[in-house]
Design a protein with these regions (language model features):
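Amphipathic alpha-helical packing segments from all-alpha helical-bundle domains
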Residues: 133-152
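Non-transmembrane alpha-helical segments in soluble domains
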Residues: 19, 74, 78, 95-98, ...
Length: 203
């Protein structure tokens, strides 16, 4: 099956988590917006004939299925791409971890747009500075510390055990994103999460 990934052409964003899984598995897929432009994504969202219309990208077309929301897409793709545990409990555990990553993505976004997404970063700098301070003081230690604990208890080198899963790829992308957005803060913090960084390096 050839998958179709719909996102925006100029940013990695939430679409990158899906893209990483497709690339890791060597899946047959087309990155629609990067091939045909953003109008293709907008057109799919606006299509009135859909019984279950997607709210926003990323969106994956898999045959007749149209699946939206990053964690939902990965929950579908994981077993099919060999990037998820085989048993139901393991698949739900991977999904639970991905949903936690989804929460973290929202918090990272809000450090730059704490007031509203409709304003430019430059229009909300004071609020962004405050949000960033709280983010690094409270949220990063709690959430990345949680993943450090998960790795310590997983029984292997990966979040779900001994095999690479889509959640490992997503945590890799989180580290990459934090290094890009907050290079100095992340460099200081990394010594507190050696297992997470080791996972990043393995991926």
């Amino acid at each position: 099956m050839r998958y179709e990934l719909y996102y925006w052409s100029t940013i990695q964003g939430r679409g990158e988590f899906v893209r990483l899984a497709l690339e890791e598995a060597g899946a047959d897929y087309i990155d629609v917006a990067r091939k045909r432009g953003d109008k293709a994504t907008a057109k799919l969202i606006a299509r009135k004939s859909q019984k279950h219309p997607p709210f926003a990208p990323p969106i994956l077309k898999a045959g007749k299925l149209v699946i939206a929301q990053t964690a939902n897409i990965l929950f579908y793709l994981g077993p099919r791409l060999g990037l998820a545990p085989k048993d139901e409990a393991g698949q739900l555990w991977a999904h639970q971890l991905q949903l936690t990553i989804t929460d973290l993505v929202v918090e990272i976004h809000d450090t730059h747009h704490p007031v509203t997404s409709w304003l430019y970063f430059e229009e909300q700098v004071p609020s962004a500075k405050r949000r960033t301070q709280d983010f690094w003081r409270y949220r990063v230690p709690k959430i990345l510390g949680y993943f450090e604990t998960v790795l310590a208890r997983s029984g292997g080198n990966y979040l779900t055990g001994r095999k690479l899963s889509y959640v490992d790829l997503s945590l890799f992308q989180i580290v990459e994103g934090l290094r890009h957005a907050f290079p100095k803060r992340m460099k200081r913090f990394e010594k507190k999460i050696p297992r997470v960084i080791a996972l990043h390096d393995r991926v």
